[in-house]
Amino acid sequence: MKIFCIGKNYVLHNEEMDGRKYKTAEPVVFMKPESALLKNGKPFFLPEHLGRVDHEVEVVVRICRLGKNISERFAHRYYDAVTVGIDFTARDLQRRLKDNGHPWEIAKAFDGSAALGEWRTIPCQEPSSDLPKEEGVEALASGESAVKTQEEPSLKKDWDGLRNGLSFHLDINGKTVQTGNTADMLYKVDELISYISRFFTLKTGDMLYTGTPVGVGPVHVDDHLEGYLEGEKLLDFWVR
């Protein structure tokens, strides 16, 4: 299972971090290990040695089939669920690493740095005979199957809402600190899936954190974090 993450995908967030509004020439992609996952409402234990750790609320999608070199027009067939998550970032450490021209994975990919909410399913369409094999569109091969389960509720909004606009926000201690809408993404989900699949084979169960909007800030011990998608609370945990 791979956790893909996108940076610099909301123009106002780019401005708050770099002092100017801009769009990168290509999506900024980085990854987190499976050990970064924090789910089921478990607390986030703040690593003291990392210094300031910021919250970055994001919409997360789940990959539902095998694919490689996927064209954007078929990308919607490759995800079957959506939720909200938090990309925790050791901000002081990240800045030091970037200033020195070093990779900054340790500031983004430490244990517990990928908080994940409850999934809400959306249609994962079956591939049809008109899809070219070179697009990487295959029947779920090698025993792979979609990860959707009967227990998972469906997203109340039609899946097209992910393209046209899903609202999400993060509350800390009852106060809203970040709000966003997928309509404001610089690179949309289908574009991101197509781009990432040029470099990595996507597999069932992989996840894509799609970037954070403006409003990032530090978390502290005893903070209560709640993440919402389309007004529904899908993420709820404490910082310890």
List PLM regions with ranges.
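Catalytic-pocket segment enriched in acidic/His residues
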Residues: 9, 13-24, 91-130, 151, ...
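Ala/Thr-enriched low-complexity intrinsically disordered regions
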Residues: 139-141, 146-149
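Extended, compositionally biased flexible segments
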Residues: 1-85, 91-96
